[in-house]
Every structure is written in C-alpha cells, then in structure tokens.
Regions:
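Active-site groove signature of glycoside hydrolases
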Residues: 2-23
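Conserved alpha/beta catalytic core and glycan-binding cleft of carbohydrate-active enzymes
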Residues: 8, 23, 29-189
Length: 189
C-alpha cells in the first residue's frame, strides 16, 4: 500500500502469484489476500498482475484469479510459438489465443484484458533465441545446462546459434516480425 500511496506506483506484478491465494484447502480466488486487496480503496484501483503458477500442489491457476486481476497467459505464448513453428496447434487454437483467450478468461466478469499475452520473459529465451536455437545452451554458467526451461518451442531454422547464412537470417527476421505482429494485434493486455 505504501508504494501505491506514497510513491504513486500504479501497478504490481507478483511472481509465482498463485501462492497469494493459498489457503489450507488449496488455491482460493476469494482467499484472504485477494479479499483484502479487493476491499482496499486504493489497491483495488491499481494494476495487479499475477504469474498464475507456483511449484505447490494445484499451482497452475491460469484463468483462476479474481476479477480485477490480470494474469500472464502462457497458453498464448505456447500456442503462438507452435503456430509460427508450424507444429501441433490448430488454426482454432491460434484464433482462440489471438482473440483474447475467452475460453480461459471469459467468466466471472473477466474480459480479454485479464490475460497478459507474452512471447518471451525474464526467465527463458529472448525473441532472438527463440528463432536461433532448437535447445538451450547454458553450459558456461556452472549449472551444467540444467537451469532454464526445456520446453522452449523454438526453432533455429537451419543452423544452431549465430549464422551468416543470409537465407536463415532472413527467415529468422521474418519470424521475429511474425511473432511481434501477432503480439501487437492480439486481444489482451
């Protein structure tokens, strides 16, 4: 509350946000923390964004946060990555994500803005990595390549890592534009 009142911060993002709704019986969107924030005249007016997962049981809660909250939409991330990679997801899956993921957020008065669409984040591949590597390469950081996510849904388009092959570079740049155009024009936040 101090940050909103005195520092004029107008929004907060909560990493591993599902923990905020943990009650003795599991995740509850009407739990104590959410209820307190919803009743506070100042905090209920700021932007609240939760990463809707944590490592606990029942930790995956995409679409489960209360009205007034937005959530990272990993369904958007995975579907769009697969779509531009020409894998598993159908045009219908892509259309659902592009039009705001109503199947996830269109309940309890929530609208497409409840989903925060993203392609990459702080704890995974960058957009450049997404079109340059089939797998992660974190060998040099002392973790024996065990850190980071293994399901990146990426493609190197013909060469792992940096390349001077003009054809591959052109495809990678086009794919970056495809990803960004999809993100910018999709419904959601």
């Amino acid at each position: 509350r101090y940050w909103a009142e005195h520092m004029h911060i107008d929004g907060f993002r909560f990493d591993l946000g599902t923990i905020l709704g943990r009650e003795p019986e599991g995740f509850d969107q009407r739990g104590g923390f959410f209820d307190a924030v919803g009743q506070d005249p100042l905090l209920r007016k700021v932007k609240l964004i939760g990463e809707p997962w944590d490592i606990g049981p029942g930790g995956y809660q995409v679409g489960g946060f209360p009205p007034g909250w937005s959530e990272w939409n990993d369904k958007y991330r995975d579907t769009v990555r697969d779509y531009w990679k020409n894998t598993d997801h159908t045009v219908q899956d892509f259309a659902a994500r592009f039009t705001g993921s109503g199947d996830v957020y269109d309940h309890r008065g929530r609208r497409p803005r409840a989903g925060v669409n993203f392609l990459t984040a702080h704890d995974g591949f960058t957009l450049h990595d997404l079109v340059s590597y089939n797998g992660k390469h974190n060998e040099a950081n002392g973790e024996d390549n065990n850190d980071g996510h293994n399901d990146n849904r990426s493609s190197n388009y013909g060469a792992e890592g940096e390349t001077e092959d003009g054809g591959i570079v052109d495809v990678r740049e086009r794919q970056k534009r495809n990803f960004l155009a999809t993100l910018f024009f999709a419904h959601g936040t």
